[in-house]
């Protein structure tokens, strides 16, 4: 199916206004590329790591894109949107082009192939199981466009470490579960019960779908939750593949929710922040029992003594 992509360049302060106009015309989706907002986040060091093309970071104005089914009324639609934008009395540039649905809705799938990580094989639902891999613990996943494929080095570090710390009978919490991969992996290792927590309702929906695909609903409970706030069970293992700042915020709560001898696995930590995260874990009472670095990222495993 063909779509019309309409792109409007405006000053950053008008991006939400333009997006609202697109929604008025029943767009199928809106994206905003705002260099000013990106630089605010970068300069505030909210992200430990980021990767954006120079064309976005160095742009003088923001770009708001919207997608509409290509129909015979497209010229009327373009004219109406143009007039609506003019009525705002703000400077803007409008561009448009035809695109295939494949190019923006499904093209990412061609790059997501089965990947081995330690004892596991992560397989997208639309791919066949590679021959000779039947002995692997298979994680089937359909992350959708809202989430990564789970094969990032931070996830791989956790998957490689999990078999040492998750075993039959363990109770596990996966904080910031995202697509649910680490919760699923814990279930495949024999954990008795897993709680998959995420503050993002979209993540909760995606995680539940992936858990259903893997037929693990009886073992994994997905909860929309802010970190461990209000979670009052004592558990054996807590996993947090998030970022350094959040792991530091989580440290004391994780320590208190773990049984004696319990394990905390933290990933998503850039190597430059490894020491401060270690210091925080030690401060609240943990003992560091494993450290591993890969590709500029760090995994820390700590035990409650």
From Swiss-Prot:
Protein name (database record): Ribosomal protein L11 methyltransferase
Q: Which GO terms describe its biological process?
A: methylation
- The organism named in the record is Carboxydothermus hydrogenoformans (strain ATCC BAA-161 / DSM 6008 / Z-2901)
Q: Which family does it belong to?
A: Belongs to the methyltransferase superfamily. PrmA family.
- Entry's Gene Ontology cellular component terms: cytoplasm
What functional role does this protein have? Answer: Methylates ribosomal protein L11.
Residues bound to S-adenosyl-L-methionine are 155, 176, 198, 241
User: What's a single GO MF annotation on this record?
Assistant: protein-lysine N-methyltransferase activity
Q: Where in the cell is it found?
A: Cytoplasm
| EC id | 2.1.1.-
What is this enzyme's class at the first EC digit?
Answer: transferase
Task: Report the catalytic activity.
Answer: L-lysyl-[protein] + 3 S-adenosyl-L-methionine = N(6),N(6),N(6)-trimethyl-L-lysyl-[protein] + 3 S-adenosyl-L-homocysteine + 3 H(+)
Q: Which UniProt keywords apply?
A: Cytoplasm, Methyltransferase, S-adenosyl-L-methionine, Transferase
The protein's superkingdom reads Bacteria
Q: Does the keyword Transferase apply?
A: yes
**What InterPro entries does UniProt report for this protein, alphabetically?**
Ribosomal_L11_MeTrfase_PrmA, Ribosomal_PrmA_MeTrfase, SAM-dependent_MTases_sf
């Amino acid at each position: 199916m063909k779509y019309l992509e309409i792109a409007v360049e405006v000053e950053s302060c008008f991006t939400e206004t333009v997006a609202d106009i697109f929604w008025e015309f029943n767009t199928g989706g809106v994206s905003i590329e705002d260099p000013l907002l990106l630089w605010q986040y970068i300069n505030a060091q909210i992200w430990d790591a980021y990767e954006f093309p120079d064309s976005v970071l160095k742009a003088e104005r923001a770009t708001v894109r919207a997608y509409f089914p290509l129909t015979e009324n497209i010229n009327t639609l373009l004219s109406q949107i143009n007039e609506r934008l003019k009525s705002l009395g703000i400077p803007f540039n409008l561009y448009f082009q035809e695109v295939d649905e494949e190019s923006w809705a499904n093209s990412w799938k061609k790059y997501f192939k089965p990947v081995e990580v330690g004892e596991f094989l992560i397989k997208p639902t639309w791919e066949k199981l590679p021959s000779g891999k039947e002995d692997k613990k298979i994680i089937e996943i359909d992350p959708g466009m809202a989430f990564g494929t789970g094969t990032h080095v931070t996830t791989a570090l956790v998957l490689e470490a999990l078999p040492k710390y998750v075993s039959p009978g363990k109770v596990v919490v996966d904080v910031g579960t995202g697509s649910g991969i680490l919760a699923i992996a814990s279930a495949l290792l024999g954990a008795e019960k897993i709680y998959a927590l995420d503050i993002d309702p979209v993540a909760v929906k995606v995680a539940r779908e992936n858990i259903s695909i893997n037929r693990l609903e009886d073992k994994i409970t997905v909860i929309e939750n802010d970190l461990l706030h209000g979670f009052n069970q004592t558990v054996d293992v807590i996993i947090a593949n998030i970022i350094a700042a959040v792991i530091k915020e989580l440290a004391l709560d994780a320590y208190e929710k773990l049984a004696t001898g319990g394990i905390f696995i933290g990933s998503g930590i850039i190597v430059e922040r490894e020491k401060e995260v270690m210091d925080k874990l030690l401060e609240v009472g943990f003992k560091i029992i494993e450290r591993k670095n890969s590709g500029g990222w760090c995994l820390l495993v700590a035990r409650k003594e």
